[in-house]
Amino acid sequence: MEILRAEHVSYSYQSKYQKVEAVKDVSCSFEQGKFYAIVGESGSGKSTFLSLLAGLDQPCEGTIYVQGEPLSGMDRDAYRLNQAAVVYQAFHLFPLLTAQENVMLPLEFKKIKKKEAASQAQRLLQRVGLESRIGRQFPKMMSGGEQQRVAIARAIAAGGEIILADEPTGNLDSGNEENVVALLNELAHEDGYTVIVITHNQRVADETDHVFRMKDGCMEQVR
């Protein structure tokens, strides 16, 4: 089933010296339960396109559809809270909160009672492969791989069907990178998420179902 679709999407902005066409007439679609990579050199438009899929920016031309509904007509904050989880290279965990408390945040935004939110957060931490003791630890006590797993658990805590990840393994060593990619694969193929990652890493791209390449704002599907 198609979850996300871009139709003739373009995005440009004015830099100090010139107009920059970051995304040029991109059309593509993403299905439920599939793992996708978007690759390309720095400045090719990958992260800009991901921000459009996340509703962080709006296309200058074209339309992004979420299960057939134009994203432009939706409450974009609600979309990111309830439908699309965004994960970044920097983990963005709150340093004064434990792992469990970090994961509880989106649940509390949804007015879920604290006891139930704590229970759900613990289950999510287990789902991403973390031992129960990690839930009581603060970010500075965790490895990079553990912090990224907490970030993924927090991102999917409120539900939804889409994971948008911008270089999620960029700060990790090869062992932790492999574990995080395996987790994203499981979330796609076992849990039914549509997982889209931006990556420079060919090893990461090789583990996905489909690969799109961007160059100078244009996109082509290469697998």
Model-predicted segments: where are they?
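Short coil-to-helix segment of the ABC ATPase nucleotide-binding domain corresponding to the Q-loop/switch region
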Residues: 97-105
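Conserved ABC ATPase "signature" region
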Residues: 115-133
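Conserved ABC transporter NBD signature motif
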Residues: 62-71
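ABC ATPase NBD coupling module
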Residues: 71-85
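Helix-to-loop junction immediately C-terminal to a conserved catalytic motif
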Residues: 54
